[in-house]
């Protein structure tokens, strides 16, 4: 007997999303729901290899969404202050575990915030911890809470070489931050100016190109050895930049890297759905309070944890590739990180449900991806 998964919707306000957002996202559902296919899909329990859960009271609001569907998630370290040491990662991990619902099996996989001053000794401590999987490279100023990030990759070489030696993974936010580079070109320029050189300098380093958004990134990843892989978000395969900008600005679709033109969306979608082991699921679910998004200077980030797997199912179904969802969501990431594939399964059923307009978020509210829209897939549990 399969029972509908009970997601933590207490306090969620079922308000309609802004009309412009409803129109943009409604077009996605109209396309997907017209695609024929099976009404039930069972896959190995998945992992999310890129997740933000924030800190303090906000953790308890968002962790249950992920923990009830995914067995593991790679937790980003860009809190305030950032998670820079193994000791800090352990303390953060305990906060996250305290927010996991009773009876739910979920293991947060931790990362350290790489800085110009991260030492080889800290890398050794991280590798010995058993719960730190890698270090996150944020170019200083590239995204939320990245001001303490890396100013020059060359300053990190001792730490990166130690990571390669010990098998820790480097997770990369792949954008330059030069004021002279156009916002939509930051990823491409990063590949040319930074990542291509890094791959050559530390050839044994395992690298994840996080939340790739361009055809350039897809081709770069494919051209590298098995030590380079990439994660892909739901918004970057379901939407292009028109969804955010045409007919009015939709702040809840603003994220970094920013949504790109349609040709890039098509290329990234093909990479995600095509069965290539180099690409795997990483939502980059990044909640912000509603007021911080609906602002004259709004924060970057899309909150998608409430329905992450159904969003990917929508995209894979649209491409006629539902049979490849399991590898993308459950196999490729675990294999790359060198951890066992999960035991157990998760089942999705084709059963539409209305996404709430808001969810409670640590005493505030967060507006989720596809707020107020009908989502055609639902996760159920055995």
Give residue ranges: language-model regions.
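N-terminal chloroplast transit peptides
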Residues: 1-20
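Short, acidic/polar
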Residues: 56-63, 117-127
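Divalent metal-dependent hydrolysis catalytic cores, especially in the metallo-beta-lactamase
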Residues: 48-49, 62-88, 103-115, 131-145, ...
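Histidine-centered catalytic micro-motifs
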Residues: 45-56, 170-176, 232, 283-285
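Histidine/acidic residue-rich metal-binding segments in metalloenzymes
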Residues: 30-32, 37-38, 122-137, 145-281
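His/Asp/Glu-enriched, well-ordered alpha-helical/loop segment
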Residues: 274-341
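Active-site neighborhoods of metal-dependent hydrolases
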Residues: 232-298, 346-382
């Amino acid at each position: 007997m399969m029972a509908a998964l009970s997601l933590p919707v207490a306090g969620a306000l079922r308000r309609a999303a802004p009309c412009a957002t409803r129109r943009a996202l409604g077009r996605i559902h109209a396309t997907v729901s017209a695609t024929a296919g099976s009404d039930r899909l069972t896959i190995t329990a998945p992992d999310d290899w890129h997740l933000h859960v924030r800190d303090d009271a906000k953790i308890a609001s968002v962790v249950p969404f992920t923990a009830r569907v995914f067995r593991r998630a790679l937790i980003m370290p860009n809190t305030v202050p950032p998670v820079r040491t193994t000791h800090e990662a352990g303390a953060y991990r305990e906060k996250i575990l305290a927010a996991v619902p009773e009876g739910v099996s979920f293991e947060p996989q931790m990362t350290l915030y790489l800085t110009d001053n991260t030492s080889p000794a800290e890398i050794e401590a991280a590798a010995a911890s058993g719960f730190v999987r890698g270090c996150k490279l944020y170019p200083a100023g590239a995204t939320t809470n990245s001001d303490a990030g890396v100013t020059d990759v060359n300053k990190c070489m001792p730490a990166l070489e130690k990571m390669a030696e010990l098998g820790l993974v480097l997770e990369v936010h792949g954008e330059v931050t030069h004021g002279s580079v156009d916002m939509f070109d930051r990823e491409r320029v990063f590949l040319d100016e930074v990542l291509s050189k890094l791959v050559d300098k530390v050839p044994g380093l395992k690298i994840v190109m996080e939340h790739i958004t361009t055809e350039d990134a897809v081709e770069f990843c494919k051209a590298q050895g098995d030590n380079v892989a990439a994660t892909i978000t739901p918004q970057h395969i379901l939407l292009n930049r028109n969804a955010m900008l045409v007919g009015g600005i939709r702040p809840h679709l603003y994220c970094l890297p920013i949504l790109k033109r349609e040709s890039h969306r098509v290329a990234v979608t093909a990479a995600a759905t095509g069965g290539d082991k180099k690409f795997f699921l990483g939502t980059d679910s990044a909640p912000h309070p509603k007021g911080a998004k609906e602002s004259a200077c709004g924060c970057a980030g899309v909150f998608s944890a409430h329905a992450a797997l159904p969003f990917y199912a929508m995209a894979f179904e649209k491409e006629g590739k539902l049979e490849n969802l399991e590898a993308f969501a459950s196999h490729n990431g675990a294999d790359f990180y060198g951890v066992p594939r999960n035991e157990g399964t998760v089942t999705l059923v084709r059963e539409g449900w209305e996404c709430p307009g808001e969810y409670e978020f640590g005493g505030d509210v967060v507006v989720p991806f596809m707020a107020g829209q009908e989502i055609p897939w639902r996760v159920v549990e055995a």
